[in-house]
């Protein structure tokens, strides 16, 4: 991607982030509730309450509060969590690896499953199997994530307890890791039993998150492949004697991958946002669960930091998808 093409996107990203900061700052202060009231003891004096509000800068006018927060963000700090008494950025970075590993695992499942059902539906187009796949796709899209999650908990965690339904790993396993990237560091250090335990804890929440995304990928990829299958070069490939499987994989799938890739990148950002409910259901210690904790405790700095993190991630993923799409499509690459 050229500098001339990249610069407007960077400016647009900066303006978008500024807008996100303003909106979240206003919204968290419009919602009823006082974070200080949730911290103080019933017998606290008005002087103690005033001192606590001054400590967190909540006694300042709103424009000054925003200016302080904006200045902190520019210097790489999101402030101090009111409820946890820790640096907000530190708290987020401790939880972010768990969510990223879960999201990438769910994305991998969605891509594999979505591609499989798209290939199967395209290969058997016009048959009863295609109708069954389309109906199942509609079911995966229609049922909310939390219903899938509760169903998995009931079936595979209670009735047939074959998989763990809460947490990120077995507390009895001490892998002595230095980072929160359990899978990556576990593989690098050869702790394969620990990695397998982490994956087992991720299967149910990842399945819950991947179902709607797999349905979307499968539907878009199938439609794109159907358009490709009527092109002249597909007919030429058939005349040359290429098998249907080879035509599907080498011609149809490859040429239909660009729109599916762009959609996958956009949906991945919503996948990160969808971790809020899923992590709560499975007691998974990621930033989704942290977001609910922040809202319940009216932790304004933590809420602001989390929303800004989500916004930044959304922008970065979309820029990465644009760059990858341009790389795969020469017409966009030289635009």
Task: Identify the function of each model-found stretch.
Residues 1-59, 89, 93, 116, ...:
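N-terminal signal-anchor/first transmembrane alpha helix
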Residues 2-5, 17-20, 96-129, 176-335:
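Alpha-helical transmembrane segments of integral membrane proteins
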Residues 13, 95, 99, 107, ...:
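Residue-level signal for discrete positions within transmembrane alpha-helices
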Residues 17-67, 156-194:
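Hydrophobic alpha-helical transmembrane segments of membrane transport/permease proteins
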Residues 41, 51-54, 68, 72, ...:
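Short amphipathic alpha-helical coupling elements at transmembrane boundaries
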Residues 59-115:
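An internal, D/E-rich "acidic patch" concept
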Residues 116, 120, 129-179:
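Hydrophobic alpha-helical segments embedded in or immediately adjacent to the lipid bilayer
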């Amino acid at each position: 991607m050229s500098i001339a093409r990249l610069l407007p996107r960077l400016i647009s990203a900066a303006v978008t982030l500024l807008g996100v900061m303003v909106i979240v700052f206003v919204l968290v202060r419009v919602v009823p509730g006082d974070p200080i009231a949730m911290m103080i003891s019933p017998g606290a004096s008005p002087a103690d309450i005033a001192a606590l509000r001054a400590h967190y800068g909540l006694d300042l006018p709103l424009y000054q509060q925003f200016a302080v927060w904006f200045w902190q963000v520019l210097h790489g700090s999101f402030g101090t969590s009111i409820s946890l008494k820790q640096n907000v950025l530190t708290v987020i970075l401790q939880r972010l690896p768990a969510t990223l590993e879960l999201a990438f695992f769910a994305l991998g499942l969605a891509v594999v499953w979505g591609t499989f059902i798209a290939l199967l539906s395209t290969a058997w187009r016009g048959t009863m199997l295609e109708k069954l796949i389309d109906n199942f796709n509609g079911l995966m899209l229609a049922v909310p994530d939390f219903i899938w999650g509760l169903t998995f908990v009931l079936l595979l965690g209670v009735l047939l307890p074959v998989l763990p339904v809460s947490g990120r790993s077995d507390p009895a396993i001490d892998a002595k890791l230095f980072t929160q990237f359990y899978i990556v560091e576990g593989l690098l250090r050869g702790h394969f039993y620990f990695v397998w335990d982490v994956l087992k804890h991720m299967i149910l929440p990842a399945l819950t998150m991947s179902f709607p995304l797999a349905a979307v990928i499968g539907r878009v990829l199938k439609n794109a492949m159907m358009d490709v299958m009527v092109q002249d070069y597909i007919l030429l490939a058939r005349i040359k004697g290429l098998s249907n499987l080879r035509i599907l994989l080498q011609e149809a799938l490859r040429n239909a991958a660009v729109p599916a890739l762009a959609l996958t990148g956009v949906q991945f950002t919503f996948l990160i946002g969808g971790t809020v409910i899923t992590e709560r259901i499975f007691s998974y210690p990621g930033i989704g669960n942290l977001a609910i904790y922040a809202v319940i405790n009216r932790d304004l700095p933590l809420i602001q930091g989390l929303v800004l993190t989500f916004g930044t991630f959304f922008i970065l993923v979309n820029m990465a998808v644009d760059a990858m799409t341009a790389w795969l499509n020469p017409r966009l690459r030289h635009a």
